[in-house]
Swiss-Prot record:
Annotated gene: GA20ox1B
Protein's recorded name: Gibberellin 20 oxidase 1-B
Swiss-Prot/TrEMBL catalytic activity: gibberellin A12 + 2 2-oxoglutarate + 3 O2 + H(+) = gibberellin A9 + 2 succinate + 3 CO2 + 2 H2O; gibberellin A53 + 2 2-oxoglutarate + 3 O2 + H(+) = gibberellin A20 + 2 succinate + 3 CO2 + 2 H2O
Keyword Oxidoreductase: yes
Domain Fe2OG dioxygenase: 199-299
Misc remark: The expression of this protein encoded by the B genome of the hexaploid wheat is much lower than the one of the two homologous proteins encoded by the A and D genomes.
InterPro entries, sorted: DIOX_N, IPNS-like_FE2OG_OXY, IPNS-like_sf, Iron_ascorbate_oxido_reductase, Oxoglu/Fe-dep_dioxygenase_dom
Length: 365
């Protein structure tokens, strides 16, 4: 087993940081990025209770946000506060375990699930200052999360699996509600995207960003657009999420009662480019660890990603070729490091494959 470079218990107190984690000038954080981005704070309680007027207002606000930068926050979402607290406690419980215990769930090369403490092996520079634990969640297999946690970490961690099984079930429910709003706002009807994602094969990720004594030299997560469809993020109270909009980086302030929602590349393709996936990153600090819970809604692996015909016409031709989520996921895990151009490069890669052209090496990305 290759030992990862990143051992939080050792590195978080060091005055210097290994060169693999140093980001070049121009990509590393700057003090002026602390300016707050005021994304819409959308109360979806009325919509969830079936109020037509509230639903129309939510639809309008979500549509405006998605055409601008693809980020918004939701409150009165129906997620139990105690479940949220349990989910955050379980993040602490896992990431404060000794490294050898966490490595029982070590992510294998080319896979998207498991424990990762750096991307060493695939990449040798601009490494993220974070640890993650990722696992699949499918409504059609309610035991999937618990079975994975017990199989990798042991029976002692069954409760952790049960907490995240409940959390993922609630995230899937909320995702489908948001998909109804997205469909309505795009004029394709509330049912279109909900049906597409009802059998979702999604990814749950626990993020842990340890303190760093040189926070202006590294990043917790580098600039990227999510290749998935929809991200529902719950931050702790530390802060660190930044979005690139109007030519500069700006921060989204954490709210305990809110989820941050953003559009991913796959949904950008499903909307024929109408709704945007936006560049974002995570910064770290020198004082305290930061935690976040990220649910990435994804379609079933072999479902064909294509926009509804009503979003395609002479004035709005197809922006991206057909693809499956499996092909995009494999692309990001084996060939390309997700960034701001993932969907563009992936689309060109698909066209080259279809034309039988020799594919260029992508390992440098």
């Amino acid at each position: 087993m290759v030992q990862p470079v990143f051992d939080a218990a050792v590195l978080s107190g060091r005055a210097d940081i290994p060169s693999q984690f140093i980001w070049p000038e121009g990509e590393s954080p700057t003090p002026d990025a602390a300016e707050e981005l005021h994304v819409p704070l959308i109360d979806i309680g009325g919509m969830l209770s079936g109020d037509p007027r509230a639903t129309a207002e939510v639809t309008r606000l979500v549509g405006e946000a998605c055409e601008r930068h693809g980020f918004f926050q939701v409150v009165n979402h129906g997620i139990d506060a105690e479940l949220l607290a349990d989910a955050h406690r379980c993040v602490d419980a896992f990431f404060t375990m000794p490294l050898p215990e966490k490595q029982r769930a070590l992510r294998r090369p080319g896979e998207s699930c498991g424990y990762a403490s750096s991307f060493t092996g695939r990449f040798a520079s601009k490494l993220p200052w974070k640890e993650t634990l990722s696992f699949r969640s499918c409504p059609s297999d309610p035991a999937l999360v618990v079975d994975y946690i017990v199989a990798t970490l042991g029976e002692d961690h069954r409760r952790l699996g049960e907490v995240y099984a409940r959390y993922c079930s609630e995230m899937s429910r909320l995702s489908l509600e948001i998909m109804e709003v997205l469909g309505e706002s795009l004029g394709v009807g509330r049912a279109h995207y909900r049906r597409f994602f009802e059998g979702n094969d999604s990814i749950m990720r626990l993020n842990y960003y340890p303190p760093c004594q040189r926070p202006m030299e590294t990043l917790g997560t580098g600039p990227h657009c999510d290749p998935t469809s929809l991200t529902i993020l719950h931050q702790d109270n530390v802060g660190g999420l930044q979005v690139h909009t109007e030519g500069r980086w700006r921060s989204i302030r954490p709210r305990a009662d809110a989820f941050v929602v953003n559009i991913g590349d796959t949904f950008m393709a499903l909307s024929n480019g109408r709704y945007k996936s936006c560049l974002h990153r995570a910064v770290v600090n020198s004082k305290v660890p930061r935690k976040s819970l990220a649910f990435f809604l994804c379609p079933e692996m072999d479902k064909v990603v294509a926009p509804p015909g009503t979003l395609v016409d002479a004035a709005n031709p197809r922006a991206y070729p057909d693809f499956t989520w499996r092909s995009l996921l494999d692309f990001t895990q084996k060939h390309y490091r997700a960034d701001m151009k993932t969907l563009e490069v992936f689309s060109s890669w698909i066209v080259q494959q279809q034309q039988g052209q020799l594919l260029p090496p992508l390992a440098s990305h």
